Amino acid sequence: MNSSGGSCSSLMDVVAYDHHLHHGHDEELHVLAVDDNLIDRKLVERLLKISCCKVTTAENALRALEYLGLGDQNQHIDALTCNVMKVSLIITDYCMPGMTGFELLKKVKESSNLREVPVVIMSSENIPTRINKCLASGAQMFMQKPLKLADVEKLKCHLMNCRS
């Protein structure tokens, strides 16, 4: 898992507002980016750092669940609360070994602590049934890989309920 920060010239206003409402203080927005492919993960991290302040990466869904406090049932509750409070958005690849991004989405949406965190699914495959299944299960958005800066802007607009 890797966590890095950077300065922002613009923030995802809605996520920032929601983050401020739920957490009551101004701190960096935190995006958890999950992808098993190192190159894709680094690309997503870089694009998000341009638009957001902080990105944590995970190489698979199981690592993401561990980070979110949903992996090991014996984790200390303070660590769980700490990480949950910091995550403003989860962006995950769909197709990963062990656990898919869709399965990660379902786990997040089943969690009382995490269900309000927006989840964006990415895939290099444009399969309408897969896209619809993810959106119906609570994904905020489904994005085609490889991600581009314009996609991050589209994501920001979508989160602000703008028309793309």
From Swiss-Prot:
The modification 4-aspartylphosphate is found at residue 93. The keyword Nucleotidyltransferase does not apply. Its main location: nucleus. CDD domains: REC_typeA_ARR. It is found in: Nucleus. Keywords: Cytokinin signaling pathway, Nucleus, Phosphoprotein, Transcription, Transcription regulation, Two-component regulatory system. Residues 30-160 form the Response regulatory domain. Two-component system major event consists of a His-to-Asp phosphorelay between a sensor histidine kinase (HK) and a response regulator (RR). In plants, the His-to-Asp phosphorelay involves an additional intermediate named Histidine-containing phosphotransfer protein (HPt). This multistep phosphorelay consists of a His-Asp-His-Asp sequential transfer of a phosphate group between first a His and an Asp of the HK protein, followed by the transfer to a conserved His of the HPt protein and finally the transfer to an Asp in the receiver domain of the RR protein. One of its GO terms (biological process) is cytokinin-activated signaling pathway. GO terms for cellular component: nucleus. Induction: By cytokinin (BA) in roots. InterPro entries: ARR-like (IPR045279), CheY-like_superfamily (IPR011006), Sig_transdc_resp-reg_receiver (IPR001789). Belongs to the ARR family. Type-A subfamily. Functions as a response regulator involved in His-to-Asp phosphorelay signal transduction system. Phosphorylation of the Asp residue in the receiver domain activates the ability of the protein to promote the transcription of target genes. Type-A response regulators seem to act as negative regulators of the cytokinin signaling. This is Two-component response regulator ARR16. The gene is ARR16.
